[in-house]
A protein has these predicted regions:
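Charged, amphipathic alpha-helical coiled-coil/dimerization segments
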Residues: 12, 63-123
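A short acidic, leucine-rich amphipathic alpha-helix
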Residues: 46-48
Length: 141
């Protein structure tokens, strides 16, 4: 567990510095990445579900993204009550830059590992993640 914490802290510090240079928080960058992975647009409800947060929280996040020129809104033609959140060209460019930073960081992370070791590590980490997501049985202790 200690190494997970140490690695997470190092990665978060690096990511925060990279994001700060673009005027973004980690959560805001996750929203931009989500939108990028969904053809540049999604409803606020879809963003709520992705982040597992409340509607007011998403309203605050997307409001700041709009103020900083990363997104715009347009009405949902299928349901006028919904607003579609859309990436701006500025956000598309920042997303490309962030993905390149992540690619370089991944290369650095795995530089001393063989391809086979990277595959094994990936498998082990996925297994640990799945173990954490399974419901725990009630134990008497």
């Amino acid at each position: 567990g200690v190494y997970f914490k140490l690695i997470t802290d190092k990665l978060r510090t690096k990511a925060d510095a990279d994001l700060k240079a673009h005027g973004l928080t980690m959560t805001q960058s996750r929203v931009l990445c989500f939108l990028s992975d969904h053809n540049g647009e999604a409803t606020q409800k879809e963003i709520e579900e992705f982040l597992s947060v409340t509607h007011p929280t998403v309203v605050g996040i997307v409001s700041r993204l709009e103020q900083n020129g990363f997104i715009t809104f347009h009405p949902d033609s299928a349901d006028k009550r919904n607003k579609i959140v859309v990436l701006t060209e500025k956000a598309v460019q920042v997303d490309k830059e962030m993905k390149e930073i992540i690619r370089r960081q991944d290369k650095k992370l795995f530089a001393s590992l063989s391809e086979e070791q990277v595959k094994e590590l990936t498998f082990l980490l996925q297994t640990i993640y799945e173990n954490l997501n399974t419901e725990e049985e009630d134990t008497p202790c």
